[in-house]
């Protein structure tokens, strides 16, 4: 592994010679005045692994579309082609529901592997325009997205969700909130070990059944999007229920938002800043911002802070502790996923 990292560093140094970028640190913080600084949390450093976030589109009162940023990274260590070839300037193709989308729009990789939208006579961006989204083959609420970089043998799968102004959202962290611990949950979930909180799948299944859109927000870097999607949307599907009904439950297949910064930076990054930025980008898609997020679940103070600072009322914010007790941030009332599942119509009245 050490040899591979050495090769990567040598290649990156050569790649940036004579370009607009500058190479400044061990992994390289690449600076280009033509790239927007906020698209990836201000991080344009080297991407070692590939990953992509889902997109949420919200239909506006005038029928226009607005969306969260398009965030995708192609990592240097993804395969032999990415290892030995420069990624700078490579073109990507976008497919929506298996149909080529936006053939006249250039999706271009930066030298560090981040994907940007390039338009004539315009600065690079990570936001699609209304016209571009209207011309995607969107069909219903949940749509299959695929980013293909043919020159590098890269395919990244994600989802595009289309919501309406009257939709109400429930946000949840993953590690320590859906799983029983941060590290143990991540490691166990990545190999399919049963590490989920008691009755958590049943609870979110019922939240979804009552008409709320469940969003997953995690400080995990996008480099782990494949493992995370597999755990949430494959492992935690059709899970055995509990007596007396023994119904089977599944986690709702909602939008997944992970840290857009590189895996190396994500280790030491402030999770509160990332989550607050993501929450704000989602809430700002709605005309009436107050009450858009009807419930928010986490297990750390940073989760609570990001929820409250985004404008979510304390009455709707819940913190789960190591004993799987759920504490309401405003009232201090203690419940559990089991209790909230049994009283689902009181906590989340049907929409």
What are these regions (language model features)?
Residues 15-159, 253:
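Intrinsically disordered, serine/threonine/proline
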Residues 19-22, 93, 100, 183-198, ...:
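C-terminal cap/substrate-recognition subdomain and adjoining C-terminal extension
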Residues 96-97, 165, 174, 322:
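Short, ordered coil/turn segments that flank beta-strands lining enzyme active or ligand-binding pockets
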Residues 142, 156-158, 202-210, 223:
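Core catalytic machinery and nucleic-acid-binding channels of phosphodiester-processing enzymes
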Residues 159-165:
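Short beta-strand edge segments in extracellular beta-sheet folds
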Residues 168-184, 307:
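Asp-based phosphoryl-transfer active-site loop
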Residues 177-178, 217-219:
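Ser/Thr-glycine-rich phosphate-binding loops at phosphate-binding pockets of nucleotides
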